[in-house]
Amino acid sequence: MELQKKFTALAQSQVELEVVVAREDAQRHYQRFVEEYLERARLPGFRKGKVPLAVLERKYGSAIRQDAAAALMEKALEEGFAQASQDSQPLPISRPSLKKKPVFDPDEDFSFAVIYDVFPSVELRNTSGFSLSVPTVSVTEEDVSRELTRIQERNALVTDKGADSCAEVGDIATVDYHEVDDSGAVRPGTERAGVVFTLGVEEGPFALGQDILGMKLGQRCLFAKRAGMLKDEAAQVRVTLKALKQRQLPSLDDELAQDVSDAFRTLDDLTRSVRQNLAEALEAALHEYKRRQLLRILVRENPFSLPESLVVGEMESRWALVMRQFGVSLSGTPQNKLQFFQQWRPEVEEHLKQRVIVELLLKQEQVSVSAEEIETEYVRIASKTGSKEERVREYYAGEEKRRALCEGIRERKLCQKLLGRCVTECGPEQSLTDFLQEQSRA
């Protein structure tokens, strides 16, 4: 098919494609299209496939021309996109929109224009020489002591509290709860039984952890809370404290160390391991902190626009995930969906821009992964997870998982290269606990 094509770059990562199909090709297309119609046509008084062309065109001519135009546009776009440059290739999630409805006349050239989204065109002008401010954090003896206490708690003996006991911080509470309406009746579908959480450590459902403190075993209380995915609905929650357990901590000694792992013979062995693990966790968190800061700077220093279909597609994926988590129909709660999209948009756009820049830098820096680096990664994963190297290799034997592994290695190598071109400045002092908690929420 003979096509005349003109690609024009527009704002917001869009392209306009103008197409002209030669009259001869349009005629041949229309003739084949009509012949297929005639083979399938059924009209009263005529056998299938025996309807005269003049009768068919008189009765359905307008509809046939519309269908023929749609089929011709689809075929022309397929050929046009196949011949388009890399910068003019449409995004898979983008559906081209007609600039205006075309008129199909088999005796004339057929022309139409569509607008569609493309991968953002980004000119990376500034990718190095940045100053990164990093908090001053270190592992203290207090941090080590706190982690040893957590180990004691994980190895504690759990026992029931007495019948007259009250809920205290550190207790393990078991509760039943349900929502009630204005008349005090149970709201159907809100009943939950046997919910367990640690007071003072976990908030629990409806953030009931603080409310339960001081309640007696078997006591029932009604609390005013906030419900809904956006916490914008008032709710009355009736709670019954069904059980209370307490932890009896073991002594911090060699015996505890040996209970934790056969690798430890003394408390000193355990303490050294704790200190090393905290140091490694801090190192990883600091690296991640610098990586995120670097990506934010790269987005700021290299501005560009995202195609709307890319942003909406990402938000739709997040919405589907939220709906599955809450067990809600995807067709419901349109108002909540709009509110979530408004809240998510800045974060989604930032995330997508970072991904675009990373993909471009991977190509620009020609980052590759060698077979030796893959083997080293297998060893690292096996050591970190306590698995055998053979099991790790088996897990990544599939093409998809192996590709994901290689992409992870490539991105780490790129990050190391980019961070090496930056200057790190020491920021304000911060405790290890606060820093790690902030990074876990980032």
Swiss-Prot record:
Enzyme class label: isomerase
InterPro entries, per database record: PPIase_dom_sf (IPR046357), Trig_fac (IPR005215), Trigger_fac_C (IPR008880), Trigger_fac_C_sf (IPR037041), Trigger_fac_ribosome-bd_bac (IPR008881), Trigger_fac_ribosome-bd_sf (IPR036611), Trigger_fact/SurA_dom_sf (IPR027304)
Domain PPIase FKBP-type: 170-250
The reaction(s) this protein catalyses: [protein]-peptidylproline (omega=180) = [protein]-peptidylproline (omega=0)
GO (cellular component) term, any one: cytoplasm
Coarse class of the protein's main subcellular location: cytoplasm
EC code(s) of this entry: 5.2.1.8
Keywords: Cell cycle, Cell division, Chaperone, Cytoplasm, Isomerase, Rotamase
GO molecular function: peptidyl-prolyl cis-trans isomerase activity; protein folding chaperone; ribosome binding
An individual GO BP term: protein unfolding
Homology family: Belongs to the FKBP-type PPIase family. Tig subfamily.
Domain comment as written in the entry: Consists of 3 domains; the N-terminus binds the ribosome, the middle domain has PPIase activity, while the C-terminus has intrinsic chaperone activity on its own.
Name of the protein this chain belongs to: Trigger factor
